[in-house]
């Protein structure tokens, strides 16, 4: 009679784990999809990515590597058996589930662990950062069978995406830069000094016409698109906005027009075609 009682703690633990997963899914709908932290050990530090995919059998081909905005530090970690990370409200982080289909995997790229205190813009230009991202993407390719990668950055994360792609043309077929930081500021040079001739990947600019952030002005997006000779997708409408001008829930983060913006980017990845303007 007493033997079955040995299984009660296991059943309770399983129920608690399932309840925790459901609670996480309610707080962050992206966590309702299969996800895991992929970590690569480097020389005394690690670099990790948060991988999300559809459940069931997938024939994965496309990988979308997302580089979030300032400070670009997710701090992917486990606390009390639960996945924890920062920047959940970031445009790319909060919308990542909308990329998913049977052929597509999404990975949000964290800063290298030894740069969690300060992830400077200048560091993202260095060969070491390029090698770190390459190691993570190569491991994701090996584990999941992805053969076609697009690097996507938003705001300050555009620097990460651009330089990681510039240094790894064999991995990044395409780069999409959204709400990009164009001008120099206290955090670094932005994209003000980049050499577009050094980028071999296909490039797409995506920007909201009413972006209120002074470091990411729409007029600069127009100028950089012309300078690079690459297409610019203009996003209009959306809202309502909340928070500061350079924060994620304003036009800077495509609030209210996220899905239409992602659909245009997805179309470009698959077909090379995008509309000139996007509105909800």
Residues of each region from the PLM?
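Bacterial N-terminal signal peptides
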Residues: 9-18
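N-terminal cap/lid segment of alpha/beta-hydrolase-fold proteins
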Residues: 24-59
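Short, surface-exposed "cap/lid" segments of acyl-processing enzymes
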Residues: 56-98
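Alpha/beta-hydrolase active-site loop
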Residues: 91, 118-144
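Conserved alpha/beta-hydrolase
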Residues: 91-116
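Primarily recognizes the serine-hydrolase "nucleophile elbow" in alpha/beta-hydrolase
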Residues: 138-198
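The feature captures the conserved acid-bearing segment of alpha/beta-hydrolase catalytic domains
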Residues: 174-237
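C-terminal catalytic histidine-bearing segment of alpha/beta-hydrolase fold enzymes
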Residues: 229-280
């Amino acid at each position: 009679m007493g033997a079955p009682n040995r299984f009660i703690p296991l059943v309770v633990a399983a129920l608690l784990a399932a309840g925790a997963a459901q609670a996480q899914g309610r707080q962050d709908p992206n966590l309702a999809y299969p996800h895991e932290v992929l970590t690569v050990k480097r020389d005394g530090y690690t670099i990790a990515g948060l991988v999300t995919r559809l459940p069931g059998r997938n024939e994965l081909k496309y990988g979308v590597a997302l580089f979030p905005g300032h400070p670009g530090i997710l701090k992917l970690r486990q606390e009390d058996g639960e996945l924890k990370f920062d920047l959940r409200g970031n445009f790319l982080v909060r919308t990542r589930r909308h990329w998913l289909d049977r052929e597509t995997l999404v990975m949000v790229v964290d800063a290298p662990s030894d740069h969690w205190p300060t992830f400077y813009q200048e560091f993202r230009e260095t060969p070491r950062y390029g090698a770190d991202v390459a190691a993570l993407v190569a491991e994701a390719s090996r584990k999941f069978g992805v053969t076609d990668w697009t690097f996507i950055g938003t705001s300050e994360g555009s620097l990460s995406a651009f330089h990681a792609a510039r240094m790894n043309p064999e991995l990044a077929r395409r780069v999409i830069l959204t709400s990009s930081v164009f001008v120099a500021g206290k955090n670094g040079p932005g994209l003000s000094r980049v050499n577009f001739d050094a980028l071999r990947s296909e490039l797409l600019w995506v920007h909201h016409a009413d972006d209120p952030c002074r470091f990411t002005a729409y007029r600069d997006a127009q100028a950089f698109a012309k300078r690079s000779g690459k297409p610019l997708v203009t996003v209009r409408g959306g809202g309502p906005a909340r928070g500061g001008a350079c924060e994620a829930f304003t036009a800077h983060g495509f609030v209210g027009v996220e899905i239409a913006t992602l659909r245009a980017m997805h179309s470009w990845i698959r077909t090379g075609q995008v509309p000139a303007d996007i509105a909800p």
